[in-house]
Amino acid sequence: MKKMKKAVYLILFSVLTANSQVMENPNTIMSLAPVEQLALTQEWDKVFPKSDKVDHRKVTFVNRYGITLAADMYTPKDAAGKLPAIAVSGPFGAVKEQSSGLYAQQLAERGFITIAFDPSFTGESGGRPRRVASPDINTEDFSAAVDFLSVLPDVDSSRIGVLGICGWGGIAIQTAINDPRIKATVASTMYDMTRVAANGYFDTDNSAEKRNAARASLAAQRTEDYRNGSYKRAGGVVDPLPTDAPQFVKDYHAYYKTPRGYHPRSGNSTDGWNVTSILPLMNFRFFEYAGELENAVMILHGEKAHSRYFGEDTFKLLCGDNKELLIVDGASHCDLYDNLDKIPMDRIAQFFSKRMPAE
């Protein structure tokens, strides 16, 4: 009898121990990653004035890769009931204190709950090393913002949209292709970052020879980075400005390198991306399934924007009668960063309201 009891105890102990080992084994954890406690600036440090028509607070959420993202949330004052919501990000290399925050605040004034978030590895968000770009992780960032908004008690989860500016305009559309929870998408003054990375501006470097030369240079830089134990930075917007700089480079300088848009956490304002961040963008192509995007899209560009061809070519890939292309008379690429006389904010709000109607 004693031997039988001992055997039962041994079996029970082994089962409990096995369960304990499974529970403590990090390779078997299936729950969401914990939200990292980020050091968030509490004072108003945006490049635009604070509105008295909305409430503002900092929020954090985690993406599917376990990276904690930081965002500014803007809510209409005296909001009642469940409201439609919009996640905003961009431009590429910028932070939420710049253009994306301005858009988010403006749309909150028009009745939406909005968040402007810093992408992974950028600004106040988590992720190491800093200033790394990834077409996969960055599209995931937008979907993670939708995750977060979907479970807020004040948000109508059937009425969530996204808005991307500059390089994040292309990322917004790419995310919407894969995430049907996004009912409406606006891409403002958009870039296709995969196209410009692989082909250069205006497709002037679109050849196997030039891409292979770029790959060889970047691969060599990887070796140097690993040897040095740190990543070489690409540099932000050029400064001082060469006298023969193209007009669009002058426009970037006028935004990122002056009090108008400079922010110390913005890579475009300071020392830029890691040089090798361009590699995954060269090896990836957005919009392969653009024709399958059923939900609504608005692409808007300035008439004079150097980036206009990205938006017009992407628009041709979209199908359905819920897609819109809006060209803003007389506007440049950077006018749609912060020039409220040029940005058709009411048209954008009307688009979201029309394409995300209350049920």
Where are these regions (language model features)?
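N-terminal cap/lid segment of alpha/beta-hydrolase-fold proteins
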Residues: 33-81, 337
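Short beta-strand element of the alpha/beta-hydrolase
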Residues: 81-91
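The serine-hydrolase catalytic nucleophile loop
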Residues: 93-105, 119, 311
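Conserved alpha/beta-hydrolase
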Residues: 106-126
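Alpha/beta-hydrolase active-site loop
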Residues: 132-153
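Alpha/beta-hydrolase-fold enzymes
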Residues: 173-257
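Short beta-strand/loop motif that positions the catalytic acidic residue
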Residues: 293, 299-301
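Catalytic histidine-centered segment of alpha/beta-hydrolase-like enzymes
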Residues: 331-342
